[in-house]
Amino acid sequence: MKGEASQVMITLTVDVEEGFHGLWPSARRTMIRYMHELPEGTFVRPLRSILKLFEEEHVRSTFFVLGKIAEAFPEVVEEIHDLGHEVASHGYSHVDLTKISLTELEEMERKNYDRLTKITGEVPRGFRAPFFGINPSIISLLSKIGYVYDSSVVPSLGIPGWWSYHSASLRAHCVSVGEGEFFEVPISVFPYLRLPIGGWFLRNFGVTYVKTAIKWFLSRGIPTIIYVHPFDVDLNAQKLGGTHFYATRRCGKYTLKAMKNLLETFDCQKVPIRDMLEKIMV
């Protein structure tokens, strides 16, 4: 590891998916029930709001793109890449990868790896599993395919519907996968409470909660990894009926302003994960 001063960094990552993909089951069922009323590609407008914010704040970040999104909207993936952001994989389909055979998973993920490479002209380096579901066998497979890091581990307390690893390291670290070198880049959590600080937690717990966690990480020289989704800044999300209020609470302007607040509050590097790894790993 290099000196702590070089590790004062924030990466505000974006999981590029449709709104119904990442919600808790009750909200997801409602979204799917009304999908025939929703135009395909409802993620595009809020995604472009995020891209615009990043341009205004001179921020480059990592976008984990779902394979089905890349398949249907290659021009959107190309747009992300052309703006200087890192394009990484969010898996081909938004399902729990731990419930799929490794043979089927390899076929799916090689397909997405090749597709992202074709669209961007660069091989994707990073991966984030849907629902943060990862295990050593999947890590080995990702390394075999060609990925060099994963950012799926959430070192948090157990949360229903999620994979949680409460005893995992808070720092990016190298993991053993045979002859290759592979890195795990854990998603940042609130200290002591061990709860996530992105997405739903940013919206429901508020920006001060997230800023407190970031200060804790940066004061210890630990790069901070936060995640959001286009859904989190979608102005239409709160119009969806049939879900608990907290599923869509503060989607839209609040979250976009909160992201702007976070980016402007901290005078440190805001970089893609690939760049962060190059800076902190010897």
What does each model-identified segment do?
Residues 1-126, 131-186, 190, 207-282:
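Catalytic alpha-helical scaffold of carbohydrate-active enzymes acting on polysaccharides/glycoconjugates
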Residues 124, 194-204:
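Surface-exposed cleft-lining segments at the edges of enzyme active sites
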